[in-house]
């Protein structure tokens, strides 16, 4: 989006819904370790994978995907509230429809990523990542995004945002 600098909007696919079994990706990771040690067999591992990852969507925690969705929303490149929706939800369906209306507005007014992705917008995104306790990968992604749009953003800018 930044490199092309054409009116555009980011639509996040959404997060996975919680498991009905009170298990998640962390459970699967733990079970992979148990399988590696020989504590459980392959069938048990597959069972935990099936009950822990029941449908589409990104990892349910504040890992890279959810962190970046939140940062991109704070940056102004996605619709408000769109980073916190489940992948399979009426809200996500509505978000997709609303994105169509929004992109038509951006096209009509010729609003480009360079008009939105300013230094201040990146600082706002960094602040949101820090407030959410998001993935440290966000620093690398935000630096790359800023570079793509020609915005001078440095790792020290992230440090400045969290100094009190």
Where are these regions (language model features)?
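Active-site cavity-forming subdomains of large catalytic enzyme subunits
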Residues: 1-124, 128-129, 142
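Single conserved hydrophobic/aromatic residue that forms the stacking wall/gate
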Residues: 154-164
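Alpha-helical support elements that line or immediately flank enzyme active sites
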Residues: 140-151
């Amino acid at each position: 989006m930044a490199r092309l600098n054409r009116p555009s909007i980011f639509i996040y696919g959404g997060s996975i819904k919680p498991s009905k079994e009170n298990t998640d990706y962390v459970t699967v990771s733990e079970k992979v370790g148990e399988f590696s040690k020989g504590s459980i067999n392959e069938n048990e591992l597959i069972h935990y994978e099936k009950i822990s990852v029941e449908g589409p969507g990104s990892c349910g925690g504040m890992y890279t995907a959810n962190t970046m969705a939140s940062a991109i929303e704070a940056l102004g490149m996605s619709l408000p509230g769109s980073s916190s929706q489940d992948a399979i939800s009426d809200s996500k369906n509505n978000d997709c429809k609303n994105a169509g209306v929004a992109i038509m507005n951006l096209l009509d007014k010729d609003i480009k990523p360079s008009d939105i992705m300013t230094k201040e917008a990146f600082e706002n995104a960094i602040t949101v990542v820090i407030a959410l306790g998001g993935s440290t990968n966000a620093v690398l992604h935000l630096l790359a995004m800023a570079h793509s749009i020609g915005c001078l953003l440095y790792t020290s800018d992230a440090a400045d945002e969290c100094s009190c």
